[in-house]
Swiss-Prot record:
SUPFAM superfamilies: Cystine-knot cytokines. One of its GO terms (biological process) is modulation of chemical synaptic transmission. It comes from Naja atra (Chinese cobra). This is Venom nerve growth factor. InterPro entries: Cystine-knot_cytokine, Nerve_growth_factor-like, Nerve_growth_factor-rel, Nerve_growth_factor_bsu, Nerve_growth_factor_CS. Expressed by the venom gland. Not glycosylated. It is found in: Secreted.
Length: 116
């Protein structure tokens, strides 16, 4: 794409896309699947829960994997990393604030090729 840094010869090893999203389910910090509350009532006001996520556009931006990696010595691919943030959730009939997993970055994973 025509990002200003590309004019300077700078490129990301993995392309990502970020957006505000809503969630209906998520994985909590204990690994349980929980229901994310669509609306949060605080002080008689209703707020919608949004989460800012970053995902990989493509796990292999180049045929050999990540952009700029020497494929003669390295295997590579792009993958998402995540973190935990607080969200109002339901598990069974229990509503509470829990840490849920959201995707926050797209990074390049490399492994050395055998015989190198």
């Amino acid at each position: 794409e025509d990002h200003p840094v590309h004019n300077l010869g700078e490129h990301s090893v993995c392309d990502s896309v970020s957006a505000w999203v809503t969630k209906t389910t998520a994985t909590d910090i204990k690994g349980n699947t929980v229901t994310v509350m669509e609306n949060v009532n605080l002080d008689n006001k209703v707020y919608k829960e949004y989460f800012f996520e970053t995902k990989c556009k493509n796990p292999n931006p180049e045929p050999s994997g990540c952009r700029g990696i020497d494929s003669s010595h390295w295997n590579s691919y792009c993958t998402e990393t995540d973190t935990f943030i607080k969200a109002l959730t339901m598990e069974g009939n229990q509503a509470s604030w829990r840490f849920i997993r959201i995707e926050t970055a797209c990074v390049c994973v490399i492994t050395k090729k055998k015989g190198n």
